[in-house]
C-alpha cells in the first residue's frame, strides 16, 4: 500500500514537472529562451510541498526580473523559467520583481516598476493575465481577493511627494481590481489577521533630507468595509510586517540610514500598540513556528559602509535566541543577504545573496543547525520565495 501511495505521489510530481517543461517544445515562430537546470544533489520528500518559486528582482531599469523553481523530490533547480514558458511576452517578466504569492491554482508576481501584477498558472507558469497597478509593492490574499499595496505615483525621491498610497482589492476569479483603500505614503508590506489588514507605511520617497519626512505608522483596514479604521504609531520608515502564530505583529523599520538604526518591533494586537522593541537590524525575516529568522543589511550615509547581521528571535518570549543563523562560517561568503525562507517541514534555511546587484546572485541552503547544505547560482538579485503546496 505504501509503495502504491508513493507511486501515485511520484506520478503526480512527474506530471507537475512535465507541465513546467512541456511548452518549450511547441513554439515554431518565436525565439525561445531556454531555462537552465541545476542539480543540488539533495533530493528529498517534503510532506505537503512540491517545491518553491524564487522571484529574482533584477536591477531597476533593465527589465530583468526572472523566475526560478526548485523541486524538492528531484533536487532540480530550474533557472529562468518564465521566459521559456511565455516567449511572446515583450520584456519578459518586467522591471523589478517585488513580491510573489500563490492563491488557489494561480501564481502572482508583483512587478513593481512595470506597474503590474503578473498572474500565472501555478503548475505551468504560463501567463493567465496581468493586472495593472501603479508602483505596486506587496500582495496578500483573503477570502477570494488579493490585496496589493501601491505607492500610487512615480518612482521619485521627493520630500514634497503628494500622491498618497493605497491598497488595491482584486477579485481572484475575474482578476479585476474592484476597490481601493487610501493609506499612508509609500505603503510596503501588508498582513491580514482576523479580518483586518495591517499595512506598513514607509514614506520612503520623502525622508531623504529629513527623518521627519518618513511615515511612522501601520494602517489598520477593516476588510468588511474596506476602510482605514485607525493608525498604530511604530517608528520611522517601516517596511515589513508579519504575523506570528498568535496573531501578533512583527514590524521592521529601515531607520534613516544615518543616526537612526533599523529595528524590529512587536505589536500586541489586542492592545493595538507597540509593546516591545528588539534591538536588532531587521531588513527581512521569516517566521516559522515560534522562531523569527532575521537578517539585517544596514547602509550608513555617514560611514558609507554596510553592516550585515543575522539573528533568531523567539516570538513567544520576544527574546533574542542567538545572533547567528549560519554557524559554519559561510556567512562571510555572502556579500548582501537579500531573501530568506525556512522549510516548514525539515527546517532547512534558505538565504539569497544579491552580491553586487548586477551579476547573477546566489541561493544558499543551510541545515536547521546553520551548516551549508548546498549553494547555486540564481538570477539577478534573488529575493522572494513562495512554497508550492502539494494539496
PLM feature segments, named:
Residues 1-9:
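N-terminal secretory signal peptides that target proteins for export/translocation
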Amino acid at each position: 500500500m505504501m509503495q502504491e501511495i508513493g507511486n501515485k505521489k511520484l506520478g503526480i510530481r512527474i506530471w507537475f514537472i512535465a507541465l513546467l517543461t512541456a511548452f518549450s517544445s511547441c513554439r515554431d515562430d518565436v525565439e525561445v529562451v531556454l531555462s537552465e537546470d541545476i542539480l543540488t544533489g539533495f533530493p528529498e520528500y517534503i510532506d505537503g510541498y512540491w517545491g518553491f518559486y524564487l522571484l529574482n528582482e533584477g536591477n531597476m531599469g533593465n527589465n530583468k526580473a526572472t523566475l526560478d523553481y526548485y523541486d524538492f523530490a528531484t533536487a532540480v533547480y530550474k533557472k529562468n523559467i518564465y521566459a521559456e514558458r511565455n516567449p511572446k511576452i515583450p520584456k519578459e517578466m518586467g522591471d523589478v520583481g517585488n513580491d510573489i504569492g500563490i492563491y488557489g491554482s494561480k501564481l502572482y508576481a508583483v512587478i513593481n516598476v512595470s506597474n503590474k501584477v503578473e498572474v500565472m498558472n501555478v503548475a505551468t507558469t504560463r501567463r493567465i493575465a496581468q493586472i495593472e497597478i501603479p508602483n505596486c509593492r506587496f500582495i496578500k490574499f483573503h477570502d477570494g481577493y488579493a490585496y496589493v499595496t501601491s505607492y500610487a505615483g512615480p518612482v521619485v525621491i521627493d520630500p514634497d511627494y503628494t500622491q498618497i498610497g493605497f491598497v488595491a482589492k482584486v477579485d481572484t476569479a475575474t482578476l479585476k481590481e474592484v476597490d481601493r483603500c487610501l493609506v499612508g505614503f509609500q505603503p510596503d508590506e501588508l498582513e491580514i489577521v482576523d479580518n483586518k489588514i495591517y499595512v506598513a507605511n514607509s514614506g520612503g520617497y520623502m525622508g531623504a533630507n529629513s527623518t521627519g519626512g518618513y511615515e511612522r505608522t501601520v494602517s489598520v483596514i477593516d476588510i468588511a468595509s474596506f476602510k482605514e479604521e485607525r493608525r498604530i504609531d511604530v517608528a520611522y520608515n517601516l517596511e515589513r510586517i508579519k504575523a506570528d502564530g498568535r496573531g501578533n505583529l512583527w514590524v521592521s523599520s529601515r531607520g534613516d540610514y544615518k543616526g537612526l538604526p533599523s529595528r524590529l518591533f512587536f505589536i500586541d494586537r489586542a492592545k493595538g500598540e507597540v509593546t516591545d522593541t528588539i534591538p536588532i537590524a531587521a531588513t527581512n525575516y521569516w517566521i516559522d513556528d515560534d522562531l523569527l529568522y532575521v537578517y539585517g543589511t544596514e547602509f550608513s550615509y555617514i560611514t558609507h559602509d554596510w553592516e550585515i547581521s543575522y539573528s533568531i528571535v523567539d516570538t513567544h518570549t520576544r527574546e533574542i535566541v542567538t545572533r547567528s543563523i549560519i554557524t559554519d562560517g559561510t556567512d562571510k561568503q555572502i556579500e548582501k543577504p537579500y531573501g530568506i525562507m525556512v522549510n516548514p517541514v525539515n527546517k532547512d534555511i534558505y538565504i539569497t545573496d544579491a552580491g553586487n546587484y548586477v551579476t547573477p546572485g546566489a541561493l544558499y541552503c543551510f541545515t536547521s543547525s546553520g551548516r551549508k547544505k548546498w549553494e547555486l547560482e540564481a538570477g539577478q538579485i534573488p529575493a522572494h520565495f513562495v512554497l508550492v503546496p502539494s494539496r
